[in-house]
Amino acid sequence: MAERSQTAPEAGNDTGNEDAIGGNVNKYIVLPNGYSGQPKKGHLTFDACFESGNLGRVEQVSDFEYDLFIRPDTCNPRFRVWFNFTVENVKELQRVIFNIVNFSKTKSLYRDGMAPMVKSTSRPKWQRLPPKNVYYYRCPDHRKNYVMSFAFCFDREDDIYQFAYCYPYTYTRFQHYLDSLQKKNMDYFFREQLGQSVQQRQLDLLTITSPENLREGSEKKVIFITGRVHPGETPSSFVCQGIIDFLVSQHPIARVLREHLVFKIAPMLNPDGVYLGNYRCSLMGFDLNRHWLDPSPWAHPTLHGVKQLIIKMYNDPKTSLEFYIDIHAHSTMMNGFMYGNIFEDEERFQRQSIFPKLLCQNAEDFSYTSTSFNRDAVKAGTGRRFLGGLLDHSSYCYTLEVSFYSYIIGGTTAAVPYTEEAYMKLGRNVARTFLDYYRLNSLVEKIAVPMPRLRSKEERRLGWEHPSCLRAEQPLEVLGIPMCSGKALNEHLGNDIQWHLDCGSSTLPLGLISCSPSSSASWNDMAMSNSILLPDHSFH
């Protein structure tokens, strides 16, 4: 049994002594000062000793307020963003305030309405806390660093509640997902182990294509996709799963893509960091996305393996490595968007804008306005920058970013929070966009059957989305309270804050609006422009 910790050195947002946080809390029981008996209901028990868990320390401020300290990434105290922990031994209708006090970033989507995720044992579907109960502010009690506080009311004594920065996606979940695909024995889906992490976790490489494209001597057009190099960026895995789900489906577009293209996907480049609950780094404290120039086989083995494979394909005269897309999540911006490279060749520079513009037309949550092309020095060593300099003029390298929080549909100002399904839908739209890019539309068989209003779960997950089939969480009816500081939270807590997990799974259909490119030059404009030529992607 562990008693409440004594005051320890505080951590600033950019620097700070994190020596007091050596690991995750393990069934940590918070007892009142001077209490020596057995724990009672309401003496909260915190735990983060599970896969992808993160909570380093808990300090009780008052009877109902707790300061929570994120455990820094292993071997690197600079990064403290991801949290994922459970709370149990609660009392019915017990109200609390949790303060996350040691974020390493000052800018955050919490300023724009983002809220932590929550679920419980009796309600296992993740939900966002109501934004009215979440506050992001400078706190004088913590060196004027930014603190995120949220108010919560526990409603079931027997439940274990779990809170997280965003939807978790663990290494084990990923392995189960790939195992389920492998059991289907699809002749166009190939899974191999490209290498192992420092802690001997598997680095999976997926190949999705028609078997004819893998015959020795055949020419190949390769699309290479990677994800989860930053372990706390969990939306990356949902987007990647959406790409995979669509490509292995029987959708006519997926069949055409498999016949003409070879998709190589390494969905989890940092399995150790994912398992440990790090935000940005590997087990040894390295930001792998800054080590593409010279990855070490012992310190960065997963990155080393992927780089060696890409170089091997680049040197193969029968292989045309046409795209490299690295999937990330962004903690301060809305929507999906891309980063691309700057080239001296003006025509090549213009050509690389084609794919993002097509994706904007296919995905309502993708913003071409937020897409940028740069040669930023701080991005040196990233996959996009390194491979953009290595590969020839026919190859394009992008970083695909997606918001941790929400997207804004064109023509509106309302933020639509992302769900797991919405992230996967973006992945499906990324895959579908290759059909437009390679001008393979005429090969897709026309289906004249009307789209039904209600379809099976599998069809909703893999198929084209009809407006009535796009679904989102029903807004929860909650009572909010105003505040600007931790002390104000205490004053306003009272009886007005009561938020309980939604007992049902009701959903509200939303209309689907076609996305138009945000820039002045649409795909059709570009096609008719004298300053840019449509890419010639002939298949012989």
From Swiss-Prot:
What compartments host this protein? Cytoplasm, Cytosol; Cytoplasm, Cytoskeleton, Microtubule organizing center, Centrosome, Centriole; Golgi apparatus; Cytoplasm, Cytoskeleton, Cilium basal body
Function, as annotated: Metallocarboxypeptidase that mediates protein deglutamylation of tubulin and non-tubulin target proteins. Catalyzes the removal of polyglutamate side chains present on the gamma-carboxyl group of glutamate residues within the C-terminal tail of tubulin protein. Specifically cleaves tubulin long-side-chains, while it is not able to remove the branching point glutamate. Also catalyzes the removal of polyglutamate residues from the carboxy-terminus of non-tubulin proteins such as MYLK.
UniProt GO molecular function:
metallocarboxypeptidase activity; tubulin binding; zinc ion binding
Q: Which SMART domains match?
A: Zn_pept (SM00631)
Entry similarity comment? Belongs to the peptidase M14 family.
- Sequence ranges assigned to domain Peptidase M14 in this UniProt record: 167-438
**Catalytic center at which residues?**
401 (proton donor/acceptor)
Q: What is its quaternary makeup?
A: Interacts with MYLK.
**What does the record say about the knockout?**
Mice are more vulnerable to DNA virus infection due to impaired immune response. Knockout mice promote somatic cell reprogramming and higher litter size at birth. Knockout blastocytes show enhanced development.
Q: Which domain of life is it from?
A: Eukaryota
Q: Where does Zn(2+) bind?
A: 230, 233, 328
Record-level GO BP terms: anterograde axonal transport of mitochondrion; axonal transport; C-terminal protein deglutamylation; central nervous system neuron development; defense response to virus; negative regulation of cell population proliferation; positive regulation of ubiquitin-dependent protein catabolic process; protein deglutamylation
| Cofactor(s) the protein requires to work | Zn(2+)
Tissues expressed in = Widely expressed. Expressed abundantly in testis, pituitary and brain and to a lower extent in eye, stomach, adrenal and kidney. In brain, expressed at low level in cerebellum as compared to cortex.
Catalytic activity reads:
(L-glutamyl)(n+1)-gamma-L-glutamyl-L-glutamyl-[protein] + H2O = (L-glutamyl)(n)-gamma-L-glutamyl-L-glutamyl-[protein] + L-glutamate; C-terminal L-alpha-aminoacyl-L-glutamyl-L-glutamyl-[tubulin] + H2O = C-terminal L-alpha-aminoacyl-L-glutamyl-[tubulin] + L-glutamate
Tell me the protein's name. Cytosolic carboxypeptidase 6
Instruction: Give the EC number(s) listed in the UniProt record.
Output: 3.4.17.-, 3.4.17.24
Entry keywords, A to Z? Carboxypeptidase, Cell projection, Cytoplasm, Cytoskeleton, Golgi apparatus, Hydrolase, Metal-binding, Metalloprotease, Protease, Zinc
Q: Name one GO cellular component term.
A: centriole
